[in-house]
């Protein structure tokens, strides 16, 4: 006869389920009345009785929690119990499995310092003998020694079996001052000339943070053995994050080992693999698009950029038995590679991640290259118009799919003689998500680039051509204005009044003399004019 408990949450899951204790072991299955269809169809979790190691009872986030330490499957957390369930669970475990349920109380002081204990399946942070919190090793993705006395622990948020409700913590840092003696249990080697029984005056020491970092790596199985890697590449140059790393590729993960930092990547983090020749015709780039991005403290790297010499070749053999290769990797990988390095690593990543490799498409610049030189903000780089996206390298790396592009605007950079040799390419995104401007592109590339974008059914607007069309239409309208028929208004302006007769000059003089006694005759007017500007000036008298 089994014992069942409803509304129990496993490993902080979003949805509750039914927990069962039977003679054969433990089981949990998500409730049929809650969760998505995929969650409901998920197979129940079963734990054989032979896997049980220790069991603890404590207060949790949702009522009371039952923590089960297993022999080979890590830690199982079940919460949602009531306080009255303790006696039932305690009796069941003792009767069925001969295991005592230990009652644990957590420290609620709220202090941020204490002691660390690296137990069998989890790291325990305790204060005065009471646990403050526990971190299962299965939840730790990576750890780095970020400073002399500081260790950063990164958590795995790509585990499909772990789907907690709400926000997740992605990193925690521990400050460990002090130092420890290395191999203090073993006698130090005697120096030359040192007498028997005389101890060495100096002993090798290391920081406490470094010792904790190395022990945590071993306990959490973060640093896999290099011999277990399917294939390894030594001293590969990365432009992002900058440095040289040894790459160990495993069945489900990738390990990057540098002089200062180490990174662990899950295969399902790699969303895209792009292989592009660099414009200098010397190097070749392989870009890995990551989601979620690689983290180094507060810095995130959504793209990893590997650089190889174009003609560099490598010869590697997969670290797999013939049987394992035939069963798992025959259709994905080659048993042995002897080719250019960037081709080998691209093919291996493609086979293990299931992502296709994106390569340059139809576009060719005036100089038969697949990229054009340009600038993005204050950074210079190269824009690669691929068959379905824009790709800008190298810093920052930008990937803009054509599906996200609303239109492309080609505009001149300025009116001076220098800037008229270049133009700007503005990529406007859909749904009012802003735009990205690539500037200082050579004018020689404009027509080729414009034709390529139009062939991809993108809306291309050329501001320079539009301005010329507007100017021509404006000039055409001005010439048409001369022939416009103004109607009766025009005739009134040009008509002659037949009743009006212009009198001669003599009549004018007579009228002026009759009504104005000071009116001057024509001859007098001429004399007055001569007195003015028409009269020659006298030469100055010289003594």
Swiss-Prot record:
One of its GO terms (cellular component) is chromosome, telomeric region. Residues 478-497, 505-531 have a biased composition (Acidic residues). One of its GO terms (biological process) is DNA-templated DNA replication. CDD domains: PH1_SSRP1-like (cd13230), PH2_SSRP1-like (cd13231), PH_TFIIH (cd13229). It is found in: Nucleus; Chromosome. Its main location: nucleus. Signal peptide: none annotated. SMART domains: Rtt106. One of its GO terms (molecular function) is nucleosome binding. Residues 532-543 have a biased composition (Basic and acidic residues). Residues 183-204, 472-543 are annotated as: Disordered. It comes from the Eukaryota. Keywords: Chromosome, DNA damage, DNA repair, DNA replication, Nucleus, Transcription, Transcription regulation. Pfam families: PH1_SSRP1-like, POB3_N, Rttp106-like_middle, SSrecog. Forms a stable heterodimer with SPT16. The SPT16-POB3 dimer weakly associates with multiple molecules of NHP6 to form the FACT complex. In contrast to the orthologous protein in animals and plants, this protein does not contain a HMG box DNA-binding domain. This function may instead be provided by the HMG box of the associated NHP6 protein in the FACT complex of fungi. Component of the FACT complex, a general chromatin factor that acts to reorganize nucleosomes. The FACT complex is involved in multiple processes that require DNA as a template such as mRNA elongation, DNA replication and DNA repair. During transcription elongation the FACT complex acts as a histone chaperone that both destabilizes and restores nucleosomal structure. Belongs to the SSRP1 family. This is FACT complex subunit POB3.
